[in-house]
Amino acid sequence: MKLTCMMIAAVLFLTTWTFVTADDSRYGLKNLFPKARHEMKNPEASKLNKREGCSSGGTFCGIHPGLCCSEFCFLWCITFID
């Protein structure tokens, strides 16, 4: 019984926390879908395609692939040519 009450309280708390910390819980999904549709029509509009501060091929990256524009890192950034 205590476990059931604790589970219900935890679910209610997490649900409330999600709505409180959301940017716009009232119109969040309404504004999300038109933007996604616009980005599908124009893939250049996507912010995910832009990589700022990344290293080009041949520069030292250690073991962190996030530093390379190509996302391939083996001590140096690797760029594949098609």
From Swiss-Prot:
Q: In which tissues is it expressed?
A: Expressed by the venom duct.
Cysteine-cysteine disulfides: 54-69, 61-73, 68-77
Q: Please state where this protein is localized.
A: Secreted
Pfam families reported for this sequence: Conotoxin
Q: List membrane-spanning regions.
A: none
Instruction: Give the range the annotation lists for the signal sequence.
Output: 1-22
Task: State the GO CC annotations.
Answer: extracellular region; host cell presynaptic membrane
Q: Which UniProt keywords apply?
A: Calcium channel impairing toxin, Cleavage on pair of basic residues, Disulfide bond, Ion channel impairing toxin, Knottin, Neurotoxin, Presynaptic neurotoxin, Secreted, Signal, Toxin, Voltage-gated calcium channel impairing toxin
Q: Single GO molecular-function term?
A: sodium channel inhibitor activity
Name the propeptide positions.
23-51
- Domain of life, per the record? Eukaryota
Q: What is known of its domains?
A: The presence of a 'disulfide through disulfide knot' structurally defines this protein as a knottin. The cysteine framework is VI/VII (C-C-CC-C-C).
Give the function comment from the record: Omega-conotoxins act at presynaptic membranes, they bind and block voltage-gated calcium channels (Cav).
Q: Which family does it belong to?
A: Belongs to the conotoxin O1 superfamily.
Identification of the protein by name: Omega-conotoxin-like 9
The species this protein was found in: Conus striatus
